[in-house]
Structures are given as C-alpha cells and as structure tokens.
Swiss-Prot record:
Protein name per UniProt: Diphtheria toxin
Summary of subunit composition and partner proteins: Homodimer.
A Pfam entry, by short name: Diphtheria_T
Intrachain S-S bonds: C211-C226, C486-C496
Signal sequence extent: 1-25
Active site, UniProt feature: E173
Gene3D superfamilies: Diphtheria Toxin, domain 1 (3.90.175.10), Diphtheria toxin, receptor-binding domain (2.60.40.700), Diphtheria toxin, translocation domain (1.10.490.40)
Native source organism of the sequence: Corynephage omega
Protein's job: Diphtheria toxin, produced by a phage infecting Corynebacterium diphtheriae, is a proenzyme that, after activation, catalyzes the covalent attachment of the ADP ribose moiety of NAD to elongation factor 2. Fragment A is responsible for enzymatic ADP-ribosylation of elongation factor 2, while fragment B is responsible for binding of toxin to cell receptors and entry of fragment A.
Keyword annotations from UniProtKB, A to Z: Cleavage on pair of basic residues, Disulfide bond, Glycosyltransferase, NAD, Nucleotidyltransferase, Signal, Toxin, Transferase
Binding-site list for NAD(+): H46, Y90
Cellular component terms per the entry's GO annotation: extracellular space
InterPro entries (UniProt xref): Diphtheria_tox_rcpt-bd_dom_sf, Diphtheria_tox_transloc_sf, Diphtheria_toxin, Diphtheria_toxin_catalytic_dom, Diphtheria_toxin_rcpt-bd_dom
Length: 560
C-alpha cells in the first residue's frame, strides 16, 4: 500500500485517538486501546533511499521538498515499521527505479518513554472529529503538540501513531510527527548502496528472507499474501484480459495510431500515456482504475516512463539478465518490488488487481518496444512479458510452498554461518580424470533455521582440461530447476550465480548440480588445480570492516 493510503488509514485511526478526556467513547471508535502501549527506548525500522544512507545516520530531518512522507497533508510524517524486511521495500528511488540501486534500512530509537497509539480507522476527518481536534489543521502536526501528548501520552514524552498493514497482519506501520522524530537515534541495519547497480538485487534477497517483499501485506489480509496467490489462475486471467483489451474498439484504434517505429522518448511517452488513459476505460481494468484514481504513483505519465525504460532494457544487447529483472521489478506502476504490482490494492481483491496490473503493464511494454527498438508482434511480446514476470515471482516464492525435497546425503554435512552443505554421495566428491567427456556432481544445501540466500558457487577449472559445462550446471530448489549464469573470474576459477533468487531453510532445500567437461583424456594431477574445494557462497557479512560473502568449502578428490 502506498504512503498516501497509509496516511489515510492512519488518519482514520487517529480520529479515534484525539477525543477529549471527557469524550472517551468517541476515541474508542478510532483508537484500539488493546494495541496501544507505552514503551521505554521504543525502536522501529525505516527504509531510506539511495544517496541518503549516510546522511540519515546523522539524524532525522524533515525534507524541505517532496511528499515529506505522504501526499496527504494530514499524514505527512516520518514513517517506520516494526518489520525491517517491510522497511527495505522503501529503499528504492521511485524516481529512478531502473538504476538498479537501493538505499538501506536503519533502526531508529526514541529516548525515554513513547506512547504508541494504535488506530482503527483510516479517515483523517473522522479521526480529528472523534478526538476533538481541529478539522482545519493537519492531523500529524496536531499529534506533535503538547496538548495532544498530555491528553493521549499517558505520561510519555511523545505519541506515535500505529496502524496494521492489513487485517490479520502482524506487521505494523508507525507515523511519527516530524519534529518529534528529530529525537530519534539512528543505527544502520543494512546498506544496499555498497552493491551499486546490484543494490536492488541485494534488497530482493534481504526481503525474501521473510517473504516481506510482498508489499501486498500492507493492503490485504495475510491470507492473500504472495505465498498463497494462485499464479496459474493469474496467468490465465491476465492472458484473457490482454485478448479482450486488444480487440476492444477504442484500444484497437489507439494501437493503430502507434508510430510503430523508433521515435524520441518524448513522443513514445506521449503516445503511451494516451494509450494508458484509453485502456483504463475498459471494464477489465475497473479495479486498477480505482487504485489509479487514489494513488498518484499509478498515473499515466509514470506508467509511460516505466514502459519505455523497460522496453529499452529488454531491447539492449548489452543488458544482462539481472538488469532485465531489475527493470521488470522496478517499483513503478504495474510491477513493484517482488509483489509491488498489488501495491495500493485496497479492495481485498488482490488476485484481480495483480492480473489487471500485469495485463496493462505487458501491453504497454509490448507497445513501447517498437518505439525504442525492433518491431515485434504485440501479442507475442505481451505474453512473453507475462510469462517472465510470473516465472520470476514463482521462483522467488514457490520454494516456500513446494514439498520438501530431501535426496538423502551419504556424507556428513558441513555446518557454517547457519548453512548446512554436503556432497550428495561419496561419488559426487570425486573428480575422475584420464578420459574425455562429462561428469556431474551434486551438492545438497540447506539452512538450519532462518531462510538464507545462495549467492553462487566458485568452481576450480583447468582451461582445456577441466572446464565448467555452463549449460548443464544448475540449482534445484525443492525440485524446481533454476539455470545459472557462469563466467570466468580468473584463469582457473569460474563463478556461477543463479539467474533468479534462491533461498534455503525451514524445509526448503537446494540441490546444486555442477557439470564439468574434459576435452582431453590427459590425466590431471593435484598440483595442476588451484583449489581442491568447491566454494558455495551465501549471505554477505562484515569481517575486519570488510564485506564478504559467507563461504562454505566442500573438498573433493581427483582420481584417475
């Protein structure tokens, strides 16, 4: 859900909090006393944008421009949450989502006593009315006044408003008055900026640890979280909608007006914005139109800019798979951070919102491609984009749904940094030489408790004698095969990374299949190979002030 929508929700809740001391009945209508509390050294988490990770650690300051936390004047404030993974979802710059960059997450703490006032409703006017507040002054500004704190603070130094992301959700969002927020101490939790254009990749890995990348939790009940969405149904719905949209008279006419050739970005965006406006009038996009009308980020201009950017990346010969993934998942209309496509879905009809969003996004990208690159078949391009998006979501999240795959290893697992790795069989730990051909070696990987990421694997090679078969090396998560991208990083080492995020733990296992190719029957001696181990890389950690990936080494034998 967007900050603006959160603001509305918080306003409704506040109305119940601000009732005069003599009007507790009204306050009870908007304040949830069972979830309100006073706490010493109250802490929460905040996601910060690229370029601000260092400055925010110096203290919280109200921005001089921009939304200042929310589009709605009543809800302008400093936002934080009790869930650090949810906070990470706000670390991407919405103005430049295709940069691949992300900011970070900080932990913020108030000194002394803080009253957390939990709200029930989302209408600012109602909240102010029920709490006996001024109807003309912004809600969050009144929350920071001495009068408000005296009436509702229960002896605390400040009042922070809270609101659940959705009915049944355990996550909570906090709204802090800007002046009060200056008292917050700031501690860095995680920094994605150090990864440069791979920052969003690191952010996705971090968020998926708790499946919190599904910002849909902010707007719908937990029963409709990303884990439980039926992607097969969404795929069918999306394709049906695309066919209906394509054949709709006004949309068909608008498509015929397309320049259908390479044009300037300005002309491409102008056409796509008009296409967006026309498409939203179709009944198949009625739910999405409602969301668009309440959330500025869904405006046609943003959709158009997003579609052009995605089309440019897809058309680029130099863009690697990660860059294309970043483009597809950029936090803009239609597609968001892992589950951002449903961001702002307030009608508890998430599946429909997702289908409508993907349908419109796919059509707009298909329309944009010939404007910035090659001419393509609109239907084919749209369907291909649908499959790419759905497949990516399934790869990230389906591992948490699929039945556990446990091949039964015959060697003792190596435990380190929360991971457990082992050769699947004793034979897998032996690299035999003296013949030409292929050999495969399986490694079982899991985590002891919390889901942890698999960043890749380092494989020793001998050019011309022992090479990695890149097309056959892959990783399977609970039986689902995921291809890997391999490249030589040194003359005798090859690094392979999954083409999609991979996590293990809590019943989710991975099987890494390493394939070697020998083009010569010449024997290999131990002193010819740079390392007698295969290194599995996990999460990033800091050692002696240097960031490194957790590494688990499995030793092998070379035999003739």
């Amino acid at each position: 859900m967007s900050r603006k929508l959160f603001a509305s929700i918080l306003i409704g809740a506040l109305l119940g909090i601000g009732a005069p001391p003599s009007a507790h009945a009204g306050a009870d209508d908007v304040v949830d006393s069972s979830k309100s509390f006073v706490m010493e050294n109250f802490s929460s988490y905040h996601g910060t944008k690229p370029g601000y990770v260092d400055s925010i650690q110096k203290g919280i300051q109200k921005p001089k421009s921009g939304t200042q936390g929310n589009y709605d004047d009543d809800w302008k404030g400093f936002y934080s949450t009790d869930n650090k993974y949810d906070a990470a979802g706000y670390s991407v710059d919405n103005e430049n989502p295709l940069s691949g960059k992300a900011g970070g997450v900080v932990k913020v703490t108030y000194p002394g006593l803080t009253k957390v006032l939990a709200l029930k409703v989302d209408n600012a006017e109602t909240i102010k009315k029920e709490l006996g507040l001024s109807l003309t002054e912004p809600l969050m500004e009144q929350v920071g006044t001495e009068e408000f704190i005296k009436r509702f603070g229960d002896g605390a130094s400040r009042v922070v408003l809270s609101l659940p992301f959705a009915e049944g959700s355990s996550s909570v969002e906090y709204i802090n008055n800007w002046e009060q927020a200056k008292a917050l101490s700031v501690e860095l939790e995680i920094n994605f900026e150090t990864r440069g254009k791979r920052g969003q990749d690191a952010m996705y890995e971090y968020m998926a640890q708790a499946c919190a990348g599904n910002r849909v939790r902010r707007s719908v009940g937990s029963s409709l979280s990303c884990i439980n969405l039926d992607w097969d149904v969404i795929r069918d719905k999306t394709k049906t909608k695309i066919e209906s949209l394509k054949e709709h008279g006004p949309i068909k006419n608008k498509m015929s007006e397309s320049p259908n050739k390479t044009v300037s970005e300005e002309k491409a965006k102008q056409y796509l914005e008009e296409f967006h406006q026309t498409a939203l009038e179709h009944p198949e996009l009625s739910e999405l139109k409602t969301v668009t009308g309440t959330n500025p980020v869904f405006a046609g201009a943003n959709y158009a800019a997003w579609a052009v950017n995605v089309a440019q990346v897809i058309d680029s010969e130099t863009a690697d798979n990660l860059e294309k993934t970043t483009a597809a998942l950029s936090i803009l209309p239609g597609i968001g951070s892992v589950m951002g496509i449903a961001d702002g879905a307030v009608h508890h009809n998430t599946e429909e919102i997702v289908a409508q969003s993907i349908a419109l996004s796919s059509l707009m990208v298909a329309q944009a491609i010939p404007l910035v690159g090659e001419l393509v078949d609109i239907g084919f391009a749209a369907y291909n984009f649908v499959e790419s998006i759905i497949n990516l979501f399934q790869v990230v999240h389906n591992s948490y749904n699929r039945p556990a795959y446990s091949p039964g290893h015959k060697t003792q697992p190596f435990l380190h940094d929360g991971y457990a790795v082992s050769w699947n069989t004793v034979e897998d730990s032996i690299i035999r030489t003296g013949f030409q051909g292929e050999s495969g070696h399986d490694i079982k990987i899991t985590a002891e408790n919390t889901p942890l990421p698999i960043a890749g694997v380092l494989l020793p090679t001998i050019p011309g004698k022992l090479d990695v078969n890149k097309s056959k090396t892959h990783i399977s998560v609970n039986g689902r095969k995921i291809r890997m991208r391999c490249r030589a990083i040194d003359g005798d080492v090859t690094f392979c990374r999954p083409k999609s995020p991979v996590y293990v733990g809590n019943g989710v296992h991975a099987n890494l299949h390493v394939a070697f190719h020998r083009s010569s029957s010449e024997k290999i001696h131990s002193n010819e190979i740079s390392s007698d181990s295969i290194g599995v890389l996990g999460y990033q950690k800091t050692v002696d002030h240097t960031k490194v990936n957790s590494k688990l080494s499995l030793f092998f034998e070379i035999k003739s």
